[in-house]
Regions:
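Surface-exposed loop/turn positions
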Residues: 13-15, 66, 166
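S-adenosylmethionine
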Residues: 95-189
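N-terminal auxiliary segments of SAM/dcSAM-dependent transferases
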Residues: 1-28
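Conserved SAM/SAH cofactor-binding pocket of Class I
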Residues: 41, 45-123
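A short, charged helix-loop
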Residues: 29-39
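Hydrophobic residues in well-ordered beta-strands that form the structural core
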Residues: 18-19, 92, 170
Length: 189
């Protein structure tokens, strides 16, 4: 059972991710952002270094009240933390309906206001109607902690959802795909 090996851990000096079935470490301070999580079958426990990279970049660039788009949300960890850090609203999408269910449940556990959080199942790369239903020129920050083979085609369409001047943060790219991803991102602006 994988749950017995997953314990609370610090993402950085201010964020702790805690499995819903575990207790907080005794040294947790009042100013710590505690994120409770049960990924179920969805990807995203927060332990992977690519998730930590996205969280670090989100903390660096997200401004209070901004709109956040989490593409390939898995457990919802990135968008949930974004809302806890002050995003005004967040959209999270995944092609896996189980991930969407996990993200909604994790939002509930973390007392996220569902008027600020929308989670949908669908493919924004191939389904133009779905992509536009997620919001055209709406988001200040887009996060995609997914495989390079998804980021490459995503780079050609995600601008539809981004405000002018918005930032796109991606992670999950293996070294052998780094140049391909860079080329796609540069080619697609």
């Amino acid at each position: 059972n994988w749950k017995k090996f997953w314990k609370p851990f610090k993402v950085d000096d201010k964020i702790i991710i805690k499995p819903t079935w575990e207790k907080l470490p005794e040294d947790t301070t009042e100013d710590t952002l505690v994120v409770e999580l049960d990924p179920g079958t969805a990807f995203g426990t927060g332990m992977h270094h690519t998730t930590r990279l996205c969280i670090t970049q989100m903390k660096k660039y997200l401004k209070e009240g901004q709109k956040l788009f989490d593409v390939g949300c898995g457990s919802g960890i990135l968008s949930i933390i974004g809302l806890m850090l002050g995003a005004g609203e967040a959209m999270a999408t995944d092609v896996d309906p189980n991930a969407v269910s996990a993200a909604i449940e994790n939002a509930r556990v973390n007392h996220i206001n569902m008027n600020q959080y929308d989670v949908k199942a669908g493919d924004i790369i191939t389904d133009v109607d779905f992509r536009h239903a997620c919001g055209v020129e709406k988001y200040d920050l887009v996060l995609a902690n997914i495989l390079a083979d998804v980021i490459i085609p995503l780079s050609g369409v995600i601008k539809d959802n981004m405000k002018p001047g918005a930032l796109f943060v991606s992670s999950g790219i293996i070294n052998t795909k780094e140049d391909d991803v860079r080329e796609a991102l540069l080619a697609n602006g």
